[in-house]
C-alpha cells in the first residue's frame, strides 16, 4: 500500500493494552459500548463543524453507525459516517494516548483486578477496548472534506507496533474491523450483538443499525435495521426514562463502569431555557487532582453538540460532577472565549451550582449511607467551596461532615446541624481543632477542659482544613472557634476559682516572672491557665496570629513562614508546675522550664528544633 510505514506504540499504550485485556476480560462486552460511543462523538463533531461548513456532509447528512459481522471470516465491523480522521489524526489518536497524567495513572495500577478494572474504566479505554476480544484490529478512515484518495489504513495486533498506510476510501467516516480471538464467537451472534447494543447504546442520539441479510430469488439482499431509540435521553420526558437508562447514559458520557450515586434531570423554561442532566459519580475520577486536565459538562446548544469539558458552567469545587447542559439561549457558534464573558453563562453556572448543592442535600437527607460514600470520595474537593463560593457558603457548610469528640471515631459523619443540636446551654461558638492526624487532634491537651465540661469539639485533620477555616467563619449564626487560639469564651468555661486557690495563684506571680525572664522574647507571654486538667503546660496563639497548622502549610508550599509567637500557659494545679515553682537551684529551674516548654511545643507542632537536647534534658531530670 502507498505510504505504508510501521510504527511502535507509545510505551504507555503497550502497558495499558496489557492491563486492559487482563483486567476487563470479565466485562469484555463493553468494547461495543466504547466503539459505538466513539462513533457517536464523531457524529457530534461533524455536526458541529458543519455548522460553519455544510459541505463537510458531502451530500450525506443522515448520520448513523452500522454494525455487521462475517461468521466465515470471524470479523465484527463498526462503521460510522462521522467526522473521520486524516493520517495525523490516526497516529495521534490510535498510536498514542493523548491524555495528560497517563504515566501517573498507570503507576497507580496494582495487582487488584477489581480495582484495576474500575481505574481503567474511569480512564476511558475507548478504541483500545477492541483488543479485549480481538487479536487484530483494522481501521479504514477518511476525514470529512478530504478527497477519497486521502483515506488512511491502520492495523495492529496490539503487541507493540502498528501499520499505517494511505488508501482510497470513497465515503467519509471510520470503519473498525475486529478480527475476533478464538473463543469469542458470541460476538458473531445476531441476538447477542443486538442485546448488547440495546443494553448500552439505547440512549444515544445516533441511530445504530445492524446488518440484515435475506435470500430472495437466489440473491442475498442486504438491508439495515435501526435497533436503538436514537433519541437523546435528556430530551425525553423524565417519567418515561428508567433508572437503568440513566445509569447507562452516565457510563456513556463519563466512561465509567460503576453506576452513579444520584442524578438530577431538569428542563427549565422561562427567562432562560435549558435542560440539564447532572450526575454525582460513586467514585472519584483518577485525575481529579490533575489541575491541567479540564473538568466540566458536555455543552449542547439546541441539541447540537458544541464541546466537551465546558468548565464555565460549574465551579472548581464541583469539578467531580458529570453530565450535560443543553441551552436554547447560546449561539451555535459559541466558543470558550464567548462563554467566559457571557451573562447567560454566569446565570446558568449559578443555577446549576444551586441544583448540585440541592441534589447533595437531598442525598444526605434521604440516604445517609450513600452520602457517606460521596463524602469519602469527594469531601476534600467540596472543602474548597467556602473559599471559592461565598454566595453558597452556608449551603456548602451544611453538606460538610466532620469527626468529633462526640463519636470517638475517625469517620467524618458529624454535620454542623448535628453539632448545633448538641450544643450546651449558653454555648455560643462551634469549637474545633486542626491537627496533622485524627489521633493528634483527639489527644490534644487543648481539649481537656472541653471534655470535662462535655462540650463537643470538631476534630479536623485534612491538610485543607486549616486553610478552609480561614473562610468558613460561621454557620447558622454561630462563630467557629479554634481551641488552640486564645479566646475569652474558653476561659469562661473554667471552674470558678475559690479564694484559697486565688491566694495560691497570687503566690505564683514571682514564679511566672522568673519564667518570663528566662524565656524572654522566645514567647509572646507567660501566664497561668485553668483550661488544663491533666497537662502541665500548653502553647496557644492570639486570635490574629498565624496558627501552627497554617505555618506548616506555608512551609510545605515552600513559602516563607513568619515566626509564630506563642503564649506559654501553665497549669497551676499540676505537680510538675508546682515542683518547678519550688525549685530554687537556678540551673535546675531553667531545665524544668525548658522541658515544660518543649513538651508544649512538641504537643502543638509535632516536631522540635532540637530533639536531642530535649532527650538529654529529659534523661537528666529523670535521674536527678
UniProtKB/Swiss-Prot annotation:
Residue ranges of region B? Answer: 337-552
Which portions of the sequence form the region A? 1-336
Q: Name one Pfam family in it.
A: HSP90
Protein origin, superkingdom: Bacteria
Q: Does Cell division show up as a keyword for this record?
A: no
Q: Does the keyword Membrane apply?
A: no
Annotated GO MF terms: ATP binding; ATP hydrolysis activity; ATP-dependent protein folding chaperone; unfolded protein binding
InterPro entries cross-referenced by the UniProt entry: HATPase_C_sf (IPR036890), Heat_shock_protein_90_CS (IPR019805), HSP90_C (IPR037196), Hsp90_fam (IPR001404), Hsp90_N (IPR020575), Ribosomal_Su5_D2-typ_SF (IPR020568)
Q: Which GO terms describe its cellular component?
A: cytoplasm
Checking SUPFAM superfamilies in the record gives:
ATPase domain of HSP90 chaperone/DNA topoisomerase II/histidine kinase (SSF55874), HSP90 C-terminal domain (SSF110942), Ribosomal protein S5 domain 2-like (SSF54211)
Annotated region described as C, given as residue ranges: 553-624
What is the annotated localization of this protein? Cytoplasm
Which key words are in the record? ATP-binding, Chaperone, Cytoplasm, Nucleotide-binding, Stress response
CDD domains per UniProt: HATPase_Hsp90-like (cd16927)
Principal localization reads cytoplasm
Q: What family name appears in the similarity comment?
A: Belongs to the heat shock protein 90 family.
Which HAMAP family is this protein grouped with? HSP90
Q: How does it assemble?
A: Homodimer.
| Role summary | Molecular chaperone. Has ATPase activity.
What name does UniProt use for this protein?
Chaperone protein HtpG
State the organism of origin.
Citrobacter koseri (strain ATCC BAA-895 / CDC 4225-83 / SGSC4696)
Q: Which gene encodes it?
A: htpG
Amino acid at each position: 500500500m502507498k505510504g505504508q510505514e510501521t510504527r511502535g506504540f507509545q510505551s504507555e499504550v503497550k502497558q495499558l493494552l496489557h492491563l486492559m485485556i487482563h483486567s476487563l476480560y470479565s466485562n469484555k462486552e463493553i468494547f461495543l459500548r466504547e466503539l459505538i460511543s466513539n462513533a457517536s462523538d464523531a457524529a457530534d463533531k461533524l455536526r458541529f463543524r458543519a455548522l460553519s461548513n455544510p459541505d463537510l456532509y458531502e451530500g450525506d447528512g443522515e448520520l448513523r453507525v452500522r454494525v455487521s459481522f462475517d461468521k466465515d471470516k470471524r470479523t465484527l465491523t463498526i462503521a460510522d459516517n462521522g467526522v473521520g480522521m486524516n493520517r495525523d489524526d490516526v497516529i495521534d489518536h490510535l498510536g498514542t494516548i493523548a491524555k495528560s497524567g497517563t504515566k501517573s495513572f498507570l503507576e497507580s495500577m496494582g495487582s487488584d483486578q477489581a480495582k484495576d478494572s474500575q481505574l481503567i474504566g474511569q480512564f476511558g479505554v475507548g478504541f483500545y477496548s477492541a483488543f479485549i476480544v480481538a487479536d487484530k484490529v483494522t481501521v479504514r478512515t477518511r476525514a470529512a472534506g478530504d478527497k477519497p484518495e486521502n483515506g488512511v489504513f491502520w492495523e495492529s495486533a496490539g503487541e507493540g507496533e502498528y501499520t499505517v498506510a494511505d488508501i482510497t476510501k470513497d465515503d467519509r467516516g471510520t470503519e473498525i474491523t475486529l478480527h475476533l480471538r478464538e473463543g469469542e464467537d458470541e460476538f458473531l451472534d445476531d441476538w447477542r450483538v443486538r442485546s448488547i447494543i440495546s443494553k448500552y447504546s439505547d440512549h444515544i442520539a445516533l441511530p445504530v443499525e445492524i446488518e440484515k441479510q435475506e435470500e430472495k430469488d437466489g440473491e442475498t439482499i442486504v438491508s439495515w435495521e435501526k435497533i436503538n431509540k436514537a433519541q437523546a435521553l435528556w430530551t425525553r420526558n423524565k417519567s418515561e426514562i428508567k433508572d437503568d437508562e440513566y445509569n447507562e447514559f452516565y457510563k456513556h458520557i463519563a466512561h465509567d463502569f460503576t453506576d452513579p450515586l444520584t442524578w438530577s434531570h431538569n428542563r427549565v423554561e422561562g427567562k432562560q431555557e435549558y435542560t440539564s442532566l447532572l450526575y454525582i459519580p460513586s467514585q472519584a475520577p483518577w485525575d481529579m487532582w490533575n489541575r491541567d486536565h479540564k473538568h466540566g459538562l458536555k455543552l449542547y446548544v439546541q441539541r447540537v453538540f458544541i464541546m466537551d469539558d465546558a468548565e464555565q458552567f460549574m465551579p472548581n469545587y464541583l469539578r467531580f460532577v458529570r453530565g450535560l447542559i443543553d441551552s436554547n439561549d447560546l449561539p451555535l457558534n459559541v466558543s470558550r472565549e464567548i462563554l467566559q464573558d457571557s451573562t447567560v453563562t454566569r446565570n446558568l453556572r449559578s443555577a446549576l451550582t444551586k441544583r448540585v448543592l440541592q441534589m447533595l442535600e437531598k442525598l444526605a437527607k434521604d440516604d445517609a449511607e450513600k452520602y457517606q460514600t460521596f463524602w469519602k470520595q469527594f469531601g476534600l474537593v467540596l472543602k474548597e467551596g467556602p473559599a471559592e463560593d461565598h454566595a453558597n457558603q452556608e449551603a456548602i457548610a451544611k453538606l460538610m461532615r466532620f469527626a468529633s469528640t462526640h463519636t470517638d471515631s475517625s469517620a467524618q459523619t458529624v454535620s454542623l446541624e448535628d453539632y448545633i443540636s448538641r450544643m450546651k446551654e449558653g454555648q455560643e461558638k462551634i469549637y474545633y481543632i486542626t491537627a496533622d492526624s485524627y489521633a493528634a487532634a483527639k489527644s490534644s491537651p487543648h481539649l481537656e477542659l472541653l471534655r470535662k465540661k462535655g462540650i463537643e469539639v470538631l476534630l479536623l485533620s485534612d491538610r485543607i482544613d486549616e486553610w478552609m477555616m480561614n473562610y468558613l467563619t460561621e454557620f447558622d449564626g454561630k462563630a467557629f472557634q479554634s481551641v488552640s487560639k486564645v479566646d475569652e469564651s474558653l476561659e469562661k468555661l473554667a471552674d470558678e476559682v475559690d479564694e484559697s486557690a486565688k491566694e495560691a495563684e497570687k503566690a505564683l506571680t514571682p514564679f511566672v516572672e522568673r519564667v518570663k525572664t528566662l524565656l524572654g522574647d522566645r514567647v509572646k507571654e507567660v501566664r497561668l491557665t485553668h483550661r488544663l486538667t491533666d497537662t502541665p503546660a500548653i502553647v496557644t496563639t492570639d486570635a490574629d496570629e498565624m496558627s501552627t497548622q497554617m505555618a506548616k502549610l506555608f512551609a510545605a508550599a515552600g513559602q516563607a513562614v513568619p515566626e509564630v509567637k506563642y503564649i506559654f500557659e501553665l497549669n497551676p494545679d499540676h505537680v510538675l508546675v508546682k515542683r518547678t515553682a519550688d525549685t530554687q537551684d537556678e540551673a535546675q529551674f531553667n531545665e524544668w522550664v525548658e522541658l515544660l516548654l518543649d513538651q508544649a511545643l512538641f504537643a502543638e507542632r509535632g516536631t522540635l528544633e532540637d530533639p536531642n537536647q530535649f532527650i538529654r534534658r529529659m534523661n537528666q531530670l529523670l535521674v536527678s
